[in-house]
A protein has these predicted regions:
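GH16 jelly-roll
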Residues: 1-231
Length: 231
């Protein structure tokens, strides 16, 4: 698939189904470019049998994986999140050399609220359940900074175009929602791992383990722009 000046695979670079998440698979029919040059990433019921894991995967999800090996710069999408229960859309990147490291610009968890609303007393303004995160290695073990939600206004992300971006330099990683800085990472041990590699950019729709496999949501994650500004 060619989109926004880049070539994209319509599945993860290692395959079409994750052996630890076999209820859904990366379905090429669930990712397409519409007449307005927008990327559409679906979730829909589309069973397919995979002999390697001896299981029929019930739900087809849209995922695109960019073939470019990216280094420092700003990575940005403008998107409307999918609407439905137990969805797991994401804009993220991971190393071409190993996993981790991984940078999650956001992972969205709709849970039982189809528009990703989640009120928490301890964080009354981070009420859209979209989380930044960063995975790394320490003492041979996979670790993460921890998922965090952030305030980016009262606009429903399933009804409004929101800009999600990350700026990656050798000295810091900054996350922005609608051009507002929401998180900054400066830990040297983490940056050293990132700075030694190149990153694979991925945009995907998805579902969580709690999804209804009998009647899964028919959802659409629409992305109208992807921009990379190298440094």
């Amino acid at each position: 698939m060619r989109w926004k000046g880049y070539d994209w695979e319509q599945h993860e670079r290692w395959g079409m189904v994750h052996p630890e998440k076999p209820d859904w698979w990366y379905d090429p029919s669930a990712s397409f470019i519409d007449s307005e040059d927008r990327l559409n990433l679906l979730t829909h019921k589309n069973p397919r049998y995979f002999s390697a894991i001896d299981k029929t995967s019930t739900i087809g999800v849209g995922l695109v994986s960019c073939k470019t090996k990216f280094k420092f710069g700003e990575f940005k999408i403008v998107a409307k999140l999918p609407y439905g229960k137990h969805l797991w859309p994401a804009f993220w990147m991971w190393s071409w050399d190993s996993w981790p490291p991984e940078i999650d610009v956001f992972e969205g968890y709709s849970d039982n609220n189809s528009n990703f609303f989640k009120f928490r007393l301890g964080k009354p303004f981070g009420f859209w359940n979209l989380q930044t995160n960063l995975h790394y290695t320490e003492d041979g073990k996979n670790k993460m900074m921890g998922g965090k939600t952030h305030y980016f206004g009262f606009k429903d992300p399933t009804k409004n175009w929101i800009t999600y971006s990350v700026t990656w330099t050798k000295d810091f990683v900054e996350f922005y929602y609608d051009d507002k800085l929401v998180r900054k990472i400066t830990e040297k041990k983490i940056l050293e791992q990132l700075n030694q590699t190149t990153m694979n950019v991925i945009i995907n729709n998805g579902v969580t383990a709690d999804v209804d496999l009998i009647n899964p949501p028919n959802s659409n994650f629409i992305i109208k722009d992807f921009v990379y500004n190298p440094f």
